[in-house]
């Protein structure tokens, strides 16, 4: 079963990688990854929302889209979505609606931008705000590299969305494993393409598997797992994979690079980790010890693959840090 899932994930990742290579043109692969990964992630959120809410409403004989349009259901559905998913997706912003708009020749890249802003905006002031704050910022839909005019940018992003839409991937509990793993493989392919710098945000599977197994020897489930140099969360997710579903109570992670920090949160969500079950920080672990607040609740497991190759300068802050002594 595991071997079959791995094969499916690898094949899915290869197809997505082919899309990236076909459509990025002269754009740097490291930059184009923000668009392909962002589009895949948006599709996941949309289809996960519909699947989750439709299942919830099936006994009422009404779909998610119908419920949002029905005054008797609207507020309840929105409150439930915010509480359990962390965000609200309006029917017009669902993946299927955007694809229909593209096929009808009525789509503009500005529609996609508004849809993303609406999703992130729905989390403001909610418990989920930190999980979604500026999550799509690296997917700059106004970037001139996509096209000098709105029409050019619309044409390219439409091609990306249509090609991604042609690839079947599911969002049921079983299918999320395949999709999440494919997402990891795709991140790995971009990391390989980036060369040495790719190691800053992705730990090779063989290394992360070994670390996860060593860190959890004798443990069947854990209250928490922490990675202070999390990158794209590959180590934490390997711990999740090794222990099994619902065996990790909470994930803690910190990552300095802003783009990688966004990828970290996307990756956790893509692997079915609810926003309530992870706490992340976008900071320098050596300079800003956000984990100091957690000293009263020791982490069960800590894993890390620090960026050893990065240059760093001596700082007086470090001389008084017990961790450096």
Regions found by a protein language model. Name each.
Residues 318-325:
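Conserved small/polar residues in nucleotide/adenosyl-binding loops
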